[in-house]
Amino acid sequence: MKRTYQPSKTRRARTHGFLVRMKTKGGRAVINARRAKGRKRLAV
């Protein structure tokens, strides 16, 4: 059986990247929450 996680940098960035997060109101909320928490990496 094939494993579920087949890494791909392109797909990772396109689904969870910074630009994608900034597109929606909810995504911006995620970035702001991570900024407030002091996360080193805001998005993938």
Swiss-Prot record:
Signal peptide: none
Organism: Delftia acidovorans (strain DSM 14801 / SPH-1)
Similarity annotation: Belongs to the bacterial ribosomal protein bL34 family.
Top-level taxonomy: Bacteria, Pseudomonadati, Pseudomonadota, Betaproteobacteria, Burkholderiales
A molecular function GO annotation: structural constituent of ribosome
Domain of life where this protein originates: Bacteria
Protein name from the UniProt record: Large ribosomal subunit protein bL34
This protein's record includes keyword DNA repair: no
A Pfam cross-reference name: Ribosomal_L34
Matches recorded under NCBIfam families: rpmH_bact
GO CC field: ribonucleoprotein complex; ribosome
Annotated keywords: Ribonucleoprotein, Ribosomal protein
